[in-house]
């Protein structure tokens, strides 16, 4: 647990400093958020730094890698050892990366074409759904139970609907930050609320494995 907390702290610092450097670089290159001409009341948001999600994803990888490296073993002292990687957690990281790529393309098109509209909404939603379908199919191939748990010890069989719910969850969580981000142009605020909620859920499950041994974010 201590290793995870330390890795999370280092990941946070990495995002903090890399974002600061990135924002300075983007400003020097005049890379910022374009504004729709008809929305004059949004003029104050013009030039807001964009593509900041890149640093969040990189920071996530830093934290993930550090949390899977053991630098100290009691009785053995300093010794670098690689901890086995949970394939489900790694897949979540890959899902986040692909969603990040979709967001990067969206921001890149905005900057490239100097307009507020990057990817069309239907194209973005389609790409996100494709990623969700791939993830859902993977978990389906692992022969997980189709039982949908409302809380520990209570659930009901929903059959194939569960895999549709997984797609809905993945796309929904992605857009809960993405759409809110568009209100002020900064992802940090909305992401903090979203990540904070996921952190609390994850910590609770970690502290109560006897109740949630058969559950994970994917199972829910």
Question: Where do the PLM segments sit?
Answer:
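"…together with the soluble PPM/PP2C metallo-phosphatase catalytic core" -> "…together
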Residues: 1-217
């Amino acid at each position: 647990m201590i290793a995870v907390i330390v890795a999370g702290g280092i990941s946070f610092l990495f995002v903090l400093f890399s974002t600061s450097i990135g924002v300075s670089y983007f400003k020097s290159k005049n890379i910022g958020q374009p504004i729709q001409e008809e929305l004059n009341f949004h003029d104050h948001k013009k030039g807001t730094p964009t593509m900041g999600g890149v640093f969040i994803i990189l920071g996530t990888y830093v934290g993930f890698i550090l949390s899977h490296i053991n630098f100290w073993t009691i009785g053995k002292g300093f010794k670098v050892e690689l901890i086995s990687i949970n394939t489900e957690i790694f897949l979540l990281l890959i899902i986040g990366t692909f969603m990040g790529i979709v967001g990067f393309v969206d921001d890149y098109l905005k900057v490239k074409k100097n307009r507020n509209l990057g990817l069309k909404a239907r194209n973005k939603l389609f790409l996100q759904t494709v990623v969700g379908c791939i993830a859902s199919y993977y978990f389906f191939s692992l022969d997980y139970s189709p039982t949908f748990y409302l809380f520990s010890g209570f659930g009901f069989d929903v059959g194939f609907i569960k895999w549709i719910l997984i797609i809905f969850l993945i796309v929904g969580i992605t857009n809960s930050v993405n759409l809110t981000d568009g209100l002020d142009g900064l992802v940090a605020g909305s992401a903090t609320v979203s990540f904070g909620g996921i952190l609390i859920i994850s910590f609770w499950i970690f502290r109560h494995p006897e109740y949630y041994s058969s559950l994970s974010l994917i199972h829910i």
